[in-house]
Amino acid sequence: MNRTCKEFLAVFSFALLLFIQAPTASAKGPTPKPLKVLVVAGGCCHDYATQTKLLKEGLEKRLHAEVTIEFNPAKGTDTTFKIYESDDWAKGYDCILHDECSAKVMDKEYVARILNAHKNGVPAVNLHCAMHSYRWGDFRQPVELGADNAGWYEMLGVQSTGHGPQSPIEVTYEKHGITQGLENWTTINEELYNNVRVYDGTTVLASGKQTMQPTKRQLKVDPDAKPREATAVVAWTNEYGPNKTRIFSTSLGHNNDTVADTKYLDFVARGLLWATGHLGKDGKPDAAFVK
């Protein structure tokens, strides 16, 4: 065998060895199971029938996730959800998305069951009227941590009591992995939820600025009343309970067109990735969980 032939065989053999050892798609490990996300929605004042569909479609389009909807079509502030009747209601889910509007649900055992899942480590994403749910006592005054009516606020990280008339909100992001790559934006007509308290340990992600026109009542008292500017924190994170469970919340999302907005859905999806531990501090998501 001449030298040229020997060299060819040596190169061919080495290349063949590399090919055999190279990992195939299956050798790299199986595709991880999709994130199991439970959306709990219903209650007063919003088109949850539409918004749950928008959230499911928007999240599943962006994430390697399966979104399950627990929807109660009731329209009252006393709306409850059958799933919460079980102590292990969150079993099997990687994240709970709270989209309830249940301000007058004051059953302490019921609320404790909800909170226990998060204390035990199940992450949460809270949207809009979830901030105005499960409240009792003198909730219009600042509530101290540890108070009888503080449980829900301790999970959220912010206490809010209301909002003014709808008008566009200028959203300005702070520097954080969740907001990495997102541009400031202005919503359509939306509700700017106030901040009675932003608790220690809460990390602000975004602030909102809104020009509020005088109401009819204000104009009746003062015909020369002028528009005023209101500002509030509109998105934040919190670490809740002994397990420091990750909680992401945004008070935006009253109207369907806001929930359908790409900018809103991108933000919520990134918040969910962060809550479940699949978004780095540098803002880079775990590639296995994005589409």
Where are these regions (language model features)?
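Solvent-exposed loop/turn segments at secondary-structure junctions
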Residues: 43-46, 73-76, 97, 101-105, ...
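Short alpha-beta junction capping motif
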Residues: 36-41, 89-138
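Aromatic-Pro/Gly-enriched surface loop or interdomain linker
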Residues: 27-93, 279-280, 285-291
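Extracellular ligand-binding/catalytic regions of CAZymes and related secreted enzymes
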Residues: 28-35, 50, 61, 212-291
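An acidic, glycine-rich "communication" segment
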Residues: 52, 127-216, 284-291
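Bacterial N-terminal signal peptides
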Residues: 9-21
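Loop/turn elements at helix/coil->beta-strand transitions in domains of secreted/extracellular proteins
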Residues: 33-36, 62-67, 91-96, 119-125, ...
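N-terminal secretory signal peptides that target proteins for export/translocation
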Residues: 1-6
